[in-house]
Amino acid sequence: QGTRTTEGVPTGLITVPSAQERSGDFLGQASSLTGKVSGTYLASLLSQKLGYAVSAGEPYYTTGCSSTSACVFPGATIPQNVWSTPATNLLNYIPAPNSGVDQFSTSAFPETVRDDKASRRVDANTHWGQLSLYYFLDNYRVDNPYPQQQGGASIPGFDALTYGQAQLITLSDAKAFGSGTVNDFHIGFLRYANVIGQPQGGLGVSLASQGFASGPTGIVVQAPQFEGVENIAFPSFVMGVPITNETQNNNTLFLSDTFSKVFSPHTLKFGGQFHWDQVNEHPNATFNGTFNITGTQTGNAFADFLLGLPSNFTQSSGEPFYLRDRYTGLFAQDSWRIRHDLIFNFGLRWEYIMPFWEKYNQLQTIIPGRQSVVYPNAPAGLVVPGDPGIPSTIAPSKPDNFAPRLGVAYSPGFDHGILNKIFGTSGNSSIRASYGMFYTAFPGLSAGIMYAVPPFGYTYLSSTPPLLATPFISAANGTQAGNPFPITFPPHNVSPSNPYTSFDFSSVIPISGDPYFYYRNDVPYTENYMFSFERQITPHTLLTMSYVGNQGHHLLGVVSTNPGDQALCLSLSQPSAVAPGSPTCGPFAEDAVITSSTRQVYRGTRVGLGPNYGEVTAQETIANSNYDALETTLRYTGRRSSFLLGYTYSKSIDQASNLGEQLNPLDLRGTRAISAFDMKHNFVASYQLALPFDQLFRRNNRLTDGWSLAGTTRFSTGLPVTLYDDSDNSLLGTLGNGINNNLLDTPDYDGAPLEINTNPRNGKSAFNVAAFSPETLGHLGNASRRFFYGPGINNFDLTLNKLVRLTESKSLEFRLEAFNAFNHAQFYGPASVDGEVNDPNFGRIVSAASPRLLQLATKFSF
């Protein structure tokens, strides 16, 4: 099977610099210019470029300012002689607005897909049993114009390739041992080799030609093959070459065996499963650096960009790593038919689930106070496999994972009375209930995200807002951070008997960007339960009503273990509170070395792990979730038509919907909210109708026979709107580290009516944006991460089918398929509403699902 598609991908509405802002005129955004010059060094740089005196603490602009004695930029205009060289050059890669004053949108750049699949199956009936050999091959290539999942751009010009090949081979044997006894055996091997996010657009432009410095104060190019337009994240868009390209080869060997024995009234099953996994990764994760610009200095992100004042700079380095995993599971169950109308199922499953380990022990964790014996010069707390009490899996593999499952099915029957109306006679209805525990293996991502952590790698995160051209120099006071790149890593034969002391930990302190795996983690599990009633209304109609629920326990979550002390940072946030020449504390500066006005030196304002650590997070099994749903279906199956109607009313709550969402270190339940995937109401109808052209025209031939219409109709409420505040005004410093796409911060909400609007055609926002505001400095926003919903779905997919029978064994089928048949604008999706309070598009519906798509298909059967 081969697939070739070329489809334009819409960017949605993106806020870009207006024509006035591209010339340095910010009078239209003057209200956002609330910042002050953060230090004496920056004041000196500005003075040199502007030709007039600028002082630390001076406002960049105040309302009505027209004199250089009152503000840095009179008239809210930034002259070009003060622009940074990188900003001047990179401005050419940012698209100009094409939809209003500061909006950009296009679908002119396509995603191209080539996907080729092939399979082969051979069956043989032998004295060994029914043997089946199956082989499957999938070779694909995708050119994505907006590779945002790889940290890539959301504007045109920076596409990336993802390509690879999957192969699966399985051998199965079903052997019967007399009546009622069967054994099923399966063994297989899966190989998945792929390259993810290989940059294509934006290459061939050196960092030096863009204006970035080299040497100790600049960016060391560690991946010259991917050197190109520098990656920069703004509140509303990302530009530049993708930063998380990798080559990944996965191998899985699996086998299972199930033995079944039927002896009335019991059906017994025993069996087991085993799989062995390899994940071999060769990443290029931020090897050439990335900037985050949020408006930390002036209050306006694009003004900061022109001035060359990013919020932070990140660069990583690391070696290939090779993850390993084993799983073993055994089970036994009995289906006991107690009576003809009553069945009881019970079973028990035992699972031995291991966290991933690394072939060369290139993993680590943090235990306060512990000193590594494998790396004796490591900072206290940083330990690795081989250190006392630290297994290769970091957390122990526990053998006590027993999971019971219970179920009952009862078919009541009554011949008369009110119960007959409800349940009908025997066989017309059924009542089912079940309960089960299900353990969940740790994802490979839990180990993979520990890549680029000392001593096996390093992620540099600027301790204070730096300069764009020289990102290892602090903008506020000119302090030069040590540039550790390139890094020499330890050999693979390090052990307690062969310790290693040559890694220079002093060059990577404070250690930041470390999402370490907690050494006391438990295996996550869920408790699932359901109760259902099924009633046959007519011989062709079946009604089902169910309650379905589950609870997740010991779920893996990410939480900061070294957050900033908000009160301390706030007390050091004003120039009068610090010594002359010292930087102040503020957003993204929680790791700065600050000297107070009383000459007390603070090596950052973080609490928990000490000054040797910056922003680090723990992956801990401390989260939970809850899901409850009412599910109803109505099924009709007739001679010429059929339909299935389904409605679900549900609610899902969790503390984090994925590893990219942090938990609140001050209150673990503080992030508990509706899940990112929660869908309150969901109605789906699928149907098929034989078109009676033969009866209408009273002719039965190839022209009138074989016509049918099928389709799927869906009406549902939208997904929740996720709220963010990327300003770090909370002063917690919960910065991104490779898995956290956003900070913990959320806006403030004043409790006013939300005024939900799901139709952007009326020009209104999706909700009342006036009810929200950026965080107050030193305080975490009070808005829940998610508590209301965006636009829903109103969609029809239709298929017109014509079957032509050529002979008894040959037929030709024609299909006309229409997706979103009525071309209804679907403002639906997890990111359809902008929830970033600092983005000018905050509260706007910025994207829509695909428009109508028509597809013709022909199938020849023989």
Tell me the role of every PLM-derived stretch.
Residues 1-2, 118-137, 169-177, 181-189, ...:
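Membrane-embedded beta-strands that build the outer-membrane beta-barrel scaffold
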Residues 141, 356-401, 652, 657-673, ...:
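Catalytic cores of eukaryotic secretory-pathway lumenal/extracellular enzymes that build
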Residues 2-90, 177, 188-229, 272-303, ...:
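A surface-exposed, glycine/aromatic-enriched loop/edge motif typical of exported proteins
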Residues 41-43, 47, 51, 71, ...:
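Short, solvent-exposed micro-motifs at the edges of structured domains
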Residues 110-114, 123, 161-165, 247-251, ...:
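Short sequence motifs at beta-strands and strand-loop junctions characteristic
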Residues 104-108, 154-159, 172, 241-245, ...:
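Extracellular loop and loop/strand-boundary signature of outer-membrane beta-barrel proteins
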Residues 174, 182-188, 250-251, 325, ...:
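Structural signature of Gram-negative outer-membrane beta-barrels, strongest in the C-terminal barrel
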